[in-house]
């Protein structure tokens, strides 16, 4: 054997180095296999969890079944979390390329495990004995104890889901490969959906018992908005009712018409200079105009004061508003209702009957009011008597709330704070990290019910924009609003109560619409045009630029308002528009910088 020319110490060092290198390679291979095996197992558990989550969603109307599914879900998410949180996995998260993939999977697994083990599972254990029929009134009374019992767990669940959603939302997607990125996006969307549901449940369990008189009797003024005569928040308050609650018992205490109210010489409450500059004092002088200001806290306070002036100073605890479209959703839960007149009020005819046919049938306003009161009382009797599918009722109320057709204002500060950032509050459009929001509000100026034949179409786009590293945008946004009159050519021959009979100087058959367009906070107006060549008014409302217009349309006519607004400082990349709820279900109005 030929001796190596290298010294013995060097040869020995080389052997040691080779041994160490070999050991490291072996460890790397073992670690890779370890991570791979655990990754496959974690993936399997997460896929099982996805299927189980679907079962949870399907069984929400059956809390006991949902509880079993959540227990299985917790087992899978717990296993996935365990597979992706050991020291080897954690160490590998620091590696280039593969590290971000592993870190994202670990964050998702940890977040889902946290949701199921500390949020949904405790809620499901409490709710397992909760029957959905508990939401069904019996003989005019709703038992409040079941809702009160799950309140704490509901809040814990809401907090837990919110924390998990924030964790997954913070994952940097830029370094992720497509399959991992898509999975993260899917979980992100799922947690947002779950967060919405648990937040709504937590708020409901806080609000409903107190509103139904758990602590003391309550009185609520209900405004039925008439979408055939537009106002910013839906329509003029036509029919009205007083609801009394006490210990879960619900009763219809009084019914009235807005025609019973006078025109006040001055606004019943101070409106403030900004509101008065845009709307004048009309919202504070006529109860039919309280919903002209697109802020239901203002509308509710005005209606409450007018009620008090008409009823010896009686102060209601809150004001609720809903419209006939929301009523049609409720009829899906109650089933058709036969009225004393023989008419059958059903989901597919309620809007037509209440907002158009009634004016052809009854020429005297007093008779119209009597019909509305009868219809409202019949629906209330069916709901309070428990003749309702509770799951369908929850769905109907949720849909009405999502479409801004159900609004609520409370005089109790703790309750109003719970409502404040929900659609039920009916507040001005608020921009946040998710979206910059415009407001599009339409109002009748004819003094008629011609808006039954009108439509309002809104679109948004970024005409130019730039995204920064944080994902926020600057640039120019274009808001387009088209008002169309679809009334028949002989609209002038319609009943006088529908056309307005020229009471406000608008010829019969013509519609007059006043629009108020709110820019998001921080946006400046660049340009504004009307397709008919008319001009604009406006002002500023609570930090938002407001542009107003007025148009008269013959049957078949339409006019378009186009605004260009600039965001010079970074805002959310998504644009959205909040619009007046009309007779048709609203279409989503949104635009994304750099997307569709």
Show which residues each predicted segment covers.
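Terminal targeting segments of Actinobacterial cell-envelope proteins
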Residues: 1-16
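Non-catalytic, solvent-exposed segments at the cell envelope interface
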Residues: 34-587, 593-596
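Hydrophobic membrane-insertion alpha-helices, especially the h-region
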Residues: 18-34
């Amino acid at each position: 054997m030929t001796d190596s020319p290298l010294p013995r110490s060097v040869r020995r060092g080389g052997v040691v180095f080779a041994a160490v290198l070999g050991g490291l390679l072996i460890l790397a291979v073992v670690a890779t296999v370890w991570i791979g095996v655990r990754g496959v197992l974690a993936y399997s558990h997460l896929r099982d969890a996805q299927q189980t989550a679907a079962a949870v969603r399907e069984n929400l109307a059956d809390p006991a079944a949902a509880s079993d599914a959540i227990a299985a879900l917790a087992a899978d998410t717990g296993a996935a979390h365990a597979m992706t949180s050991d020291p080897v996995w954690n160490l590998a998260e620091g590696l280039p390329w593969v590290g971000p993939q592993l870190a994202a999977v670990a964050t998702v697994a940890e977040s889902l495990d946290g949701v199921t083990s500390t949020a949904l599972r405790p809620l499901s254990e409490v709710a397992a004995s909760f029957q959905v029929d508990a939401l069904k009134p019996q003989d005019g009374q709703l038992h409040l104890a079941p809702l009160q019992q799950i309140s704490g767990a509901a809040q814990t669940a809401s907090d837990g889901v919110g924390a998990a959603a924030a964790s997954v939302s913070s994952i940097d997607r830029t370094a992720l490969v497509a399959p991992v990125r898509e999975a993260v996006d899917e979980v992100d969307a799922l947690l947002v959906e779950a967060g919405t549901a648990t937040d709504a449940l937590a708020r409901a369990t806080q609000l409903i018992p107190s509103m139904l008189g758990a602590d003391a009797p309550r009185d609520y003024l209900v405004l039925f908005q008439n979408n055939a005569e537009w106002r910013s928040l839906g329509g003029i308050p036509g029919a009205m009712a007083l609801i009394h609650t006490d210990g879960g018992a619900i009763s219809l205490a009084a019914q009235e018409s807005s025609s019973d109210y006078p025109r006040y010489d001055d606004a019943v409450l101070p409106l403030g200079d900004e509101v008065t500059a845009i709307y004048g004092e009309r919202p504070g002088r006529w109860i039919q105009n309280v919903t002209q200001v697109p802020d239901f806290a203002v509308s509710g306070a005005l209606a409450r004061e007018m009620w008090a002036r008409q009823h010896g100073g009686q102060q209601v605890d809150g004001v609720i508003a809903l419209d006939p479209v929301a009523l049609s959703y409720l009829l899906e839960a109650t089933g058709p209702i036969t009225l004393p007149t023989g008419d059958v009020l059903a989901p597919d005819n309620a809007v037509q009957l209440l907002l158009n046919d009634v004016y052809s049938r009854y020429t005297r306003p007093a008779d119209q009011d009597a019909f509305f009161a009868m219809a409202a009382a019949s629906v209330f009797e069916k709901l309070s008597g428990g003749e309702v599918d509770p799951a369908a009722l929850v769905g109907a109320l949720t849909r009405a709330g999502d479409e801004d057709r159900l609004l609520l204002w409370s005089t109790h500060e703790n309750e109003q704070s719970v409502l404040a950032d929900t659609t039920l509050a009916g507040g001005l459009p608020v921009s946040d990290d998710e979206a910059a929001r415009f407001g599009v509000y339409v109002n009748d100026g004819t003094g008629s019910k011609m808006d039954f034949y009108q439509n309002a179409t809104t679109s948004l786009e970024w005409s130019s924009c730039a995204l920064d590293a944080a994902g926020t945008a600057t640039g120019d946004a274009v808001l387009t609003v088209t008002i169309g009159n679809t009334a028949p050519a002989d609209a002038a021959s319609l009943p006088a109560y529908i056309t307005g009979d020229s009471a406000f100087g608008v010829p019969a058959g013509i519609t007059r619409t006043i629009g108020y367009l709110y820019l998001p906070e921080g946006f400046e107006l660049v340009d504004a045009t009307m397709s008919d060549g008319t001009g604009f008014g406006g002002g500023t409302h609570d930090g938002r630029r407001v542009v107003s217009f007025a148009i008269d349309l013959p049957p078949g006519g339409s006019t378009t308002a186009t605004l260009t607004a600039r965001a010079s400082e970074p805002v959310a990349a998504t644009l959205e528009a909040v619009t007046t709820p009309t007779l048709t279900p609203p279409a989503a109005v949104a635009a994304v910088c750099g997307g569709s």
